[in-house]
Structure formats: C-alpha cells, structure tokens
Design a protein with these regions (language model features):
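Catalytic cores of secreted/periplasmic lytic hydrolases that degrade extracellular macromolecules
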Residues: 1-126
Length: 126
C-alpha cells in the first residue's frame, strides 16, 4: 500500500466528518492533507498536528491559539498548533467556509471533486 493510500485510510473518518458538516468533498480534503503534510510526515504535522499548513494569524494568537515557528516561504513563520489531527481538519474546513473567495465551491455538490479542485485553484488555494 502506498503512503498516500495509508494516509487516506488513516484519516478518512476525519475527512468524511468534515464532508457531512460542511459539504467539502472528503477526497479533496484528504488530497490537500496528503500534499500539505507529506502524508502526515512533515515536521508541522508531526509536531503541531497541522496537516494543512495553516498559518497562525494575529487573531488566532490573540484568542490564545498555540503556534509553532517554522521556515516556509520565509524564516520564522508562525503556524497553528492543534491538540489533535481532528482539530486541524476542523480548522481547515472553517478556513474554507469563512473565506469568501471559496464561496463558489460551496455551491457545488460534495461529490463534485473536480469542480472543487478547479474552484479552489481558481480562488488561489496555495
């Protein structure tokens, strides 16, 4: 079994829960998690339970959100730290829901993974 398959199998329940709650295709969420976290093996995923590379905003920090400091695009960037992988999946979904640039995606059906991936790319998802 490939590392991608192992990741998808291990975290499928989290992705399915997010699909039920928010309508985001589980396959899209898993694909983003696979890419962003190197199949859950990145330092950010291992140390901070952050599977989507979500950066800690000033609002996150002001509300008491924990963060780790890593070099990504620039040195010493702040990334959200979560108590669990499930919290990371939930924050990823809320990030998409609360960001107006992704609104068009939410007009699509949860089984329209192609439309979702195109919509996310057009909206500028990194």
């Amino acid at each position: 079994m490939s590392k991608n398959q192992q990741y998808a199998e291990q975290y499928a329940d989290f992705a399915m829960e997010q699909m039920r709650r928010y309508g985001i295709p589980a396959s899209v969420t898993l694909a983003q998690g696979i890419l962003e976290s190197s199949n859950g093996q990145s330092r950010l995923a291992q140390n901070e339970n952050n599977h989507f590379g979500i950066k800690a905003t000033p609002a996150w920090i002001a509300e008491g959100g924990r963060y780790g400091i890593y070099t990504d695009d620039k040195p010493n960037e702040k990334f959200c730290s979560y108590d669990s992988v499930g919290d990371s999946y939930e924050h990823h979904s809320r990030f998409l829901v609360e960001n107006k640039r992704y609104d068009r995606c939410f007009a699509l059906a949860p089984d329209d993974y192609k439309g979702w991936t195109e919509g996310l790319a057009k909206a500028g998802y990194a």
